[in-house]
């Protein structure tokens, strides 16, 4: 799976913003042409932060590559702005003081271990996003999260469990599955401003 160019990443962020602003204004965005890579099935997340204080304002996505990226991006953007249960819906006026971030994901792969303690060696902060599954419980953290909070791998796993509604040490239990994925991250420097690729390592 090839990486996106900065030009394609810039398009992704600009498109996510346009989708949100049109949706909040009661309009449907019509796009006639876009880079070919956006026809590929890829997972993605849209994250909104307040500007300039960078407080989280919404983050939702589609982790699995189940639809063309252009569609996944539209769904993730609208959901991040209006359906994140942690926050009230974003208003159109607020978009003047929000920066948009888009993460393009690699397909999740199961981390195989003989003993759960091996996760501590196999997971790399700044590279790996994680998904935990246990029965009906599921939680996901993007690779930028442990970097932003300064967590080590054990803290990362504990917070992953909490995100899924599980006890923090549940990653040590039998029957738990943990998947990893990588993300290419593009973000606005300021609202509607330059888009850069965010490097975690």
Curated annotation (Swiss-Prot):
PROSITE patterns: AMMECR1
Stored Pfam families: AMMECR1
Superkingdom, taxonomy of origin: Archaea
Residue ranges constituting the AMMECR1 domain according to the UniProt record: 7-197
NCBIfam families linked to this entry: AmmeMemoSam_A, TIGR00296 family protein
HAMAP family in alphabetical order: AMMECR1
Protein known as: Protein MJ0810
Organism: Methanocaldococcus jannaschii (strain ATCC 43067 / DSM 2661 / JAL-1 / JCM 10045 / NBRC 100440)
Taxonomic lineage of the native organism: Archaea, Methanobacteriati, Methanobacteriota, Methanomada group, Methanococci
